[in-house]
C-alpha cells in the first residue's frame, strides 16, 4: 500500500492578548527567529505535500514575515477557536485523502524527530487521529488526556472542567494532532459552540472523529507553549540550554552557562572558552583555543585560533589567529585583523585592514584604513576619515609608527618605515615617503604674565611656599576625645595662622558628618577607620572634611562635625605657614564663611583689583609652524 501524503496546518490567527503587544504573538522573536519561523523550519524537514498557515489577526504582518517560505495562507476572518480555524481548511483541502498534521503556531521547541515519530505512529496503528501528549510534573493549566493500557484515548477534559480526581492525572494534551483528513472533514461541519468560551474546539473533533491514540513526547519541554512574556523567557532558556549542552559535549567550555547566550548559527571549535556575560549572534565561526569574554559581544564574525577578546564588541568582522582584543575595544563592521595583532583598550576600528604583528594598544580610532604588518599605533592616534560629506581612505605601510596624539587626515598615503612624531597632525594628501621621520607640530609659545590677566576670574590663586617655612605640629588624641573640638582648641591655643592637615590616621567609635548637599548631621554609630582628614585651621575656626570606612569597607565622607569620638587613637600631623594668615570671612558669592588668604607681607591674594590693560604694546607676528617637516 502506498504511503499517504502528509499536509501540515499551522494555526497562527490568534492575537495573543496576554503578550500585551501590537505584534501578533507568533511573530515574537525567540532568539534570532520568530516563534512561527522556528516551528515552520522544523515542519518543513518532514517535506509535507502542502504547508498551510491559518492567519487572522494582523495577517499582513504574518504573510510578510513568511514570504520566503513555501507556504499557503488560509484566512480565518473571525477567531472563533481552534476548531473554527481548521474548518477553514475544508474548501482548501477538498478531496485530499492523506494525513493532516495540525500544530499551534506558538509551540516553537518541537523537534523534527518528535513530529516524524508522531506521523509514523499514526500510520502504523492507522487510527483516525494520533495526538501528542506528555507526562509532566505539574499539569496545572493544561487539558488532561485519559488513555487505556493500549494508549487509546478515552477522554479529553479541559483543566477548568476537571474533577479533583481527574486533576491528579499528569498526562496533558499538547495540541499537536495527526488526523486522517477524510475522517476529520466529515466531523468538522458538526462542531458546535456549546461551551463557556463560545468557541469551536478542535478537541471536540478528536472526540467525534473515531479511534484516537496518544503518543507521549520524550521531553515535555518540547511542547512548551508561549502565551505571555514569562513563557517566552522560559522557552528562550530551554533553547539556550539545548545549544550549550550540545556544544559542551563537543568540547566547548562555558564558564557560567546561565550568563552567556548564543544562536544556532554559531560554530565553535574544540577548546573554545566562553566566559561569563558573553553573547554570540548571527553567523559566527570561532577557532580552537579562543577565549571569548568575559563581557563580550560577538556578532556575525569569524575569529581564528588562540585569540582572547575581553570586554569588547566585534561585529561583522574577521579576526586572525592569536589576536588580543580589549578590554573595551570596538571592532566595527568590515574590519580585518591579521595574525598576532593587538587591539587594546578603547580602540575602535571600522572598515580597517590591519596586517599581522601590528598593534594599536590604546585610545585610537582606525576608520577606513589599511595598515601593513608590524605597524605600531601610538596612544591617542586618530584617523580623521570624514570631511563632513564623504569618507576617505588612509594607507600606512609596513613597520611604520605613529606617536601619541597623532592625527592623520584622510585621504593619506604613509610609506613604509615611517615614524610620525608625537602630537603631529598630518594634512590630507601630504606626501610621506618611505623611511622618514615627520614632525608636524607648532613650537611652544610662552606668554609671560598670563596669570595676571585671568586672576579676576580665578579668585583663589595658589601662592608659592618658601622651602623650610612650615611649622609642624604632631599630636595624638586618646579614647573618648572629640576630634573636631580638640583640633579647634589647638588652633586657638597655638595659635595657628595658616594651618592645614598633613596626615591623619586612627579610629572612631562613632562619627558625625554633614553629607554633601545636606543641611542636617548624619550619625554613624559604629567603629570606623579614619581614611583621610583634610582642610584648613585658623583662630577663626576650622573647615575640615573627613573620610571614614566601616567594617564592610563602605566609605563615608563629609564635613567634620562635633561628635566624632576617638576609639583607640588618632595620630595627626598639622602644619602652619608663617608666610600667610588664614581667616574665615563672609563670601558675597556663596553666602558662607569662606577661606580668606592674607600674605603676611603684601596685598591679600583675594579679592584683588583687576589688572590694568597695557597700552601701546604690539604682538610680534608668529612664524607659521603649522606645516609638517619631513626629515629624510
Swiss-Prot record:
GO terms for molecular function: glucosamine-1-phosphate N-acetyltransferase activity; magnesium ion binding; structural constituent of carboxysome shell; UDP-N-acetylglucosamine diphosphorylase activity. It is found in: Cytoplasm. It is an enzyme of class 2 (transferase). Pfam families: Hexapep, NTP_transf_3, PCC. Binds 1 Mg(2+) ion per subunit. It comes from the Bacteria. Residues 621-632 have a biased composition (Basic and acidic residues). Its cofactor is Mg(2+). This is Bifunctional protein GlmU. Homotrimer. GO terms for cellular component: carboxysome; cytoplasm; membrane. It comes from Synechococcus sp. (strain JA-2-3B'a(2-13)) (Cyanobacteria bacterium Yellowstone B-Prime). Residues 1-229 are annotated as: Pyrophosphorylase. It catalyses: alpha-D-glucosamine 1-phosphate + acetyl-CoA = N-acetyl-alpha-D-glucosamine 1-phosphate + CoA + H(+); N-acetyl-alpha-D-glucosamine 1-phosphate + UTP + H(+) = UDP-N-acetyl-alpha-D-glucosamine + diphosphate. In the N-terminal section; belongs to the N-acetylglucosamine-1-phosphate uridyltransferase family. In the C-terminal section; belongs to the transferase hexapeptide repeat family. UDP-N-acetyl-alpha-D-glucosamine binds at residues 11-14, 25, 76, 81-82, 143, 158, 173, 227, 332, 350, 365, 376. Its main location: cytoplasm. Acetyl-CoA binds at residues 379, 385-386, 422, 441. One of its GO terms (biological process) is UDP-N-acetylglucosamine biosynthetic process. Keywords: Acyltransferase, Cell shape, Cell wall biogenesis/degradation, Cytoplasm, Magnesium, Metal-binding, Multifunctional enzyme, Nucleotidyltransferase, Peptidoglycan synthesis, Repeat, Transferase. Pathway: Nucleotide-sugar biosynthesis; UDP-N-acetyl-alpha-D-glucosamine biosynthesis; N-acetyl-alpha-D-glucosamine 1-phosphate from alpha-D-glucosamine 6-phosphate (route II): step 2/2; Nucleotide-sugar biosynthesis; UDP-N-acetyl-alpha-D-glucosamine biosynthesis; UDP-N-acetyl-alpha-D-glucosamine from N-acetyl-alpha-D-glucosamine 1-phosphate: step 1/1; Bacterial outer membrane biogenesis; LPS lipid A biosynthesis. Transmembrane segments: none annotated.
Amino acid at each position: 500500500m502506498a504511503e499517504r501524503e502528509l499536509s501540515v496546518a499551522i494555526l497562527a490567527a490568534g492575537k495573543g492578548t496576554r503578550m500585551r503587544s501590537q505584534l501578533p504573538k507568533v511573530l515574537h522573536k525567540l532568539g534570532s527567529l520568530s516563534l512561527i519561523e522556528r516551528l515552520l523550519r522544523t515542519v518543513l524537514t518532514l517535506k509535507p505535500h502542502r504547508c498551510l498557515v491559518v492567519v487572522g489577526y494582523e495577517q499582513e504582518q504574518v504573510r510578510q514575515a513568511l514570504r520566503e517560505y513555501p507556504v499557503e495562507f488560509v484566512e480565518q476572518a473571525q477567531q472563533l477557536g481552534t476548531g473554527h480555524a481548521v474548518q477553514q481548511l475544508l474548501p482548501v483541502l477538498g478531496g485530499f485523502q492523506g494525513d493532516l498534521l495540525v500544530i499551534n503556531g506558538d509551540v516553537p521547541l518541537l523537534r523534527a524527530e518528535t513530529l516524524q515519530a508522531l506521523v509514523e505512529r499514526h500510520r502504523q496503528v492507522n487510527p483516525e487521529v494520533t495526538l501528542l501528549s506528555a507526562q509532566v510534573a505539574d499539569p496545572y493549566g493544561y487539558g488532561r488526556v485519559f488513555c487505556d493500557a493500549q494508549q487509546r484515548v478515552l477522554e479529553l477534559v479541559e483543566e477548568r472542567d476537571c474533577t479533583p480526581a481527574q486533576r491528579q492525572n499528569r498526562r496533558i494534551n499538547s495540541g499537536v494532532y495527526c488526523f486522517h483528513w477524510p475522517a476529520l472533514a466529515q466531523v468538522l461541519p458538526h462542531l458546535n459552540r456549546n461551551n463557556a468560551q463560545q468557541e469551536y474546539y478542535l478537541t471536540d473533533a478528536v472526540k467525534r472523529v473515531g479511534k484516537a491514540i496518544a503518543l507521549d513526547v520524550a521531553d515535555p519541554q518540547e511542547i512548551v507553549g508561549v502565551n505571555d512574556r514569562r513563557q517566552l523567557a522560559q522557552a528562550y532558556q530551554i533553547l539556550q540550554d539545548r545549544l550549550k549542552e550540545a556544544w559542551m559535549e563537543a568540547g566547548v567550555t562555558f564558564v557560567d552557562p546561565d550568563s552567556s547566550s548564543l544562536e544556532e548559527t554559531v560554530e565553535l571549535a574544540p577548546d573554545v572558552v566562553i566566559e561569563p556575560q558573553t553573547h554570540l549572534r548571527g553567523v559566527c565561526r570561532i577557532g580552537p583555543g579562543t577565549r571569548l569574554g568575559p563581557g563580550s559581544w560577538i556578532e556575525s564574525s569569524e575569529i581564528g585560533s588562540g585569540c582572547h577578546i575581553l570586554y569588547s564588541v566585534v561585529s561583522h568582522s574577521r579576526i586572525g589567529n592569536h589576536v588580543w582584543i580589549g578590554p573595551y575595544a570596538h571592532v566595527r563592521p568590515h574590519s580585518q585583523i591579521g595574525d598576532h595583532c593587538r587591539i587594546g583598550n578603547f580602540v575602535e576600528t571600522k572598515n580597517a585592514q590591519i596586517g599581522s604583528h601590528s598593534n594599536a594598544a590604546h585610545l585610537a580610532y582606525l576608520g577606513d584604513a589599511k595598515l601593513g604588518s608590524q605597524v605600531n599605533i601610538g596612544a591617542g592616534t586618530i584617523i580623521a576619515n570624514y570631511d563632513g560629506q564623504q569618507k576617505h581612505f588612509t594607507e600606512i605601510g609596513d613597520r611604520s609608527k605613529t606617536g601619541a596624539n597623532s592625527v592623520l587626515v584622510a585621504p593619506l598615503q604613509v610609506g613604509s618605515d615611517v615614524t610620525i612624531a608625537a602630537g603631529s597632525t598630518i594634512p590630507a594628501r601630504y606626501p610621506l615617503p618611505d623611511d622618514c621621520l615627520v614632525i608636524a607640530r607648532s613650537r611652544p609659545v610662552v606668554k609671560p604674565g598670563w596669570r595676571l590677566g585671568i586672576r579676576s576670574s580665578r579668585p583663589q590663586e595658589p601662592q608659592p611656599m618658601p622651602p623650610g617655612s612650615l611649622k609642624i605640629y604632631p599630636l595624638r588624641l586618646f579614647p573618648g576625645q572629640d576630634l573636631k573640638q580638640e583640633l579647634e582648641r589647638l588652633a586657638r591655643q597655638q595659635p595657628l595662622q595658616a594651618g592645614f592637615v598633613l596626615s591623619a590616621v586612627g579610629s572612631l567609635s562613632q562619627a558625625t558628618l554633614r553629607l554633601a548637599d545636606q543641611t542636617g548631621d548624619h550619625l554613624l554609630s559604629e567603629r570606623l577607620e579614619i581614611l583621610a582628614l583634610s582642610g584648613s585651621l585658623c583662630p577663626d575656626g576650622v573647615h575640615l572634611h573627613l573620610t571614614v570606612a566601616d567594617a564592610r569597607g563602605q566609605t563615608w565622607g563629609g564635613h567634620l562635625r562635633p561628635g566624632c569620638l576617638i576609639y583607640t587613637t588618632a595620630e595627626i600631623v598639622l602644619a602652619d605657614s608663617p608666610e600667610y594668615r588664614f581667616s574665615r570671612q563672609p563670601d558675597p558669592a556663596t553666602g558662607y564663611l569662606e577661606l580668606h588668604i592674607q600674605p603676611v607681607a603684601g596685598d591679600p591674594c583675594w579679592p584683588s583689583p583687576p589688572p590694568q590693560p597695557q597700552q601701546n604694546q604690539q604682538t610680534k607676528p608668529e612664524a607659521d609652524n603649522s606645516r609638517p617637516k619631513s626629515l629624510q
